[in-house]
From Swiss-Prot:
Thiol-specific peroxidase that catalyzes the reduction of hydrogen peroxide and organic hydroperoxides to water and alcohols, respectively. Seems to contribute to the inhibition of germination during stress. The keyword Nucleus applies. The keyword Nucleus applies. The lineage of its organism: Eukaryota, Viridiplantae, Streptophyta, Embryophyta, Tracheophyta. This is Probable 1-Cys peroxiredoxin. Its EC number is 1.11.1.24.
């Protein structure tokens, strides 16, 4: 990688990692994405989340390309490592292969982003086509959702943002919910009367 040899398992350690692939260095959408990732690095760092990029280009290419990324967004620094996977073995193992995009060497990485948890398991994946850049605000929101869910035995509803109500997980009984959420919770009165949609604040 651009930071020396990295073993993904060791890099994750006991924290969260955003592992993201890009189809190629010196390409337009990827340049804007990695610049955006650099701009958001402090947001992820505040949440205890590390970043790790990967593509099939070699380390020297990554290092040269980094100059373009930083020039495109003045003030942004690419402080996270970018891994080189020239034989494409890692992207295949990580299910980051684009079925349609190829070069002379074979299939290229897709625009995939995995959020990996402390247990080394993928908690969430985004898959974008090569023509569509990622939305970093949504990546931050997804990280906040995962961290909140892991800490409080809750789930987050559609369009949720930090500070808004969350829903209590279906596996938590009302009795257990009273202990877990002494601040109380609201059960929505729906036609089915099943009492499954319970909102609370955490």
């Amino acid at each position: 990688s651009t930071h020396g040899k990295i073993r993904i398992h060791d890099y994750v350690a006991n924290g969260y990692v955003i592992l993201f692939s890009h189809p190629g260095d010196f390409t337009p959408v990827c340049t804007t994405e990695l610049a955006a990732m650099a701009n958001y690095a402090k947001e992820f760092e505040k949440r205890g989340v590390k970043l790790l990029g990967i593509s099939c280009d070699d380390v020297q290419s990554h290092k040269e390309w980094t100059k373009d990324i930083e020039a495109y967004k003045p003030g942004s620094k690419v402080t996270y490592p970018i891994m080189a996977d020239p034989d494409r073995s890692a992207i295949k193992q990580l299910n980051m292969v684009d079925p349609d995009e190829k070069d002379a060497e074979g299939q290229l990485p897709s625009r995939t982003l995995h959020i990996v948890g402390p247990d080394k398991k993928v908690k969430l994946s985004f898959l974008y086509p090569s023509c569509t850049g990622r939305n970093m605000d949504e990546v931050v929101r997804a990280v906040d959702s995962l961290l909140t869910a892991a800490k409080h035995k809750v789930a987050t509803p559609a369009n949720w943002k930090p500070g808004e109500c969350v829903v209590i997980a279906p596996g938590v009984s009302d009795e257990e919910a009273k202990k877990l959420f002494p601040q109380g919770f609201e059960t929505k009165d729906l036609p089915s009367k099943k009492g499954y949609l319970r909102f609370t604040k955490v």
